[in-house]
Amino acid sequence: MTSTVDVLAYIPSPPQGVWYVGPVALRAYALFIIVGIVVAIVWGDRRWVARGGEKGTVLDIAIWAVPFGLIGGRLYHVMTDWPTYFGEGGDPVDALKVWQGGLGIWGAVALGGVGAWIGCRRRGIPLPALGDAVAPAILLAQAIGRLGNYFNQELYGRETEVPWGLEIFERRNDVGQVSPQLIDGVSTGEVAFVVHPTFLYEALWNVLIVLLLVWVDRRFRIGHGRLFALYVAGYCAGRFWIELMRSDHASLIAGVRVNSFTSALVFVAALVYFFAATKGREDPAELRPADGGPVGGGGEPVDGEIAQKEPEKNVEDAGKDEGTSASEPVSDDKAASTASTGGEAGTKTIDSKKDDAND
């Protein structure tokens, strides 16, 4: 009787993580990643506007940050799990198959930050301030993305008998292969083993840190990248102990899982930044791009603008200015007088230019 109750209390895995609509594959992992990105952009933009920024800024920055983040996340995953793709029995082409899962958060944050920096430079806004605005939204997006791991039957912990243990099913694909690691497969109904749902632990931890960040931001009104640093430190603290519960294959550094090692280093760096950064919050005026420079017009030309030359007068207009007509004959005495006057004027002009050059 006790055994039956325990089994009924286990969390079942989804029967599959991929559905096909004709030739199109709908992958739960990709859908949750997309939902997380949308939530991060929408909520992040609202927080940015509430802090004094312009509406739509986060979307503009995301155009740079999201592609960079996806590439960085995949690169980190491949580098820290390289035997899967480049070791014995591995296929290097699989490293490009992002839809099969495998994004490292550290690579996503690092390279995504580079993309955000580029976007902020183009918009003329401070990157630390943007990071503070989107920090809770990014962490909530991470929690949503972890549900994709649930459908893929991945990122789980050691085997357990706790009532909230996760059932991992055997899955069969189209060619008849049977394994719990088949992302494209469908459950056979047979339970391979029961494990700690570490992806769920991380998702719940992320939600708790999101609530903490929102409270701290409202209570203390911190800025200059310090809230983002608090997000990084909080996430690292949770990721460190969750990694210790995982039993899946991972690269090791001095016998420690690489993600635990990275979490510890980044945690320390985040705390150092948190205490060293400027206190208080940015002035709302700093969150809006500066107005464009002055537009040239009359008066002195501004930088980057070329002064317009006065249009040259034709012979007929010049004659009218001198009080003569182009068709009126000019006497020899008058012509000589005009030439003499023009010569003197030319000499004065040359002398004047010499004086200007010597100033």
From Swiss-Prot:
A 1,2-diacyl-sn-glycero-3-phospho-(1'-sn-glycerol) binds at residue 146. Pfam families: LGT. Keywords: Cell membrane, Membrane, Transferase, Transmembrane, Transmembrane helix. It is an enzyme of class 2 (transferase). Belongs to the Lgt family. Catalyzes the transfer of the diacylglyceryl group from phosphatidylglycerol to the sulfhydryl group of the N-terminal cysteine of a prolipoprotein, the first step in the formation of mature lipoproteins. This is Phosphatidylglycerol--prolipoprotein diacylglyceryl transferase. It comes from Rhodococcus jostii (strain RHA1). The lineage of its organism: Bacteria, Bacillati, Actinomycetota, Actinomycetes, Mycobacteriales. The gene is lgt.
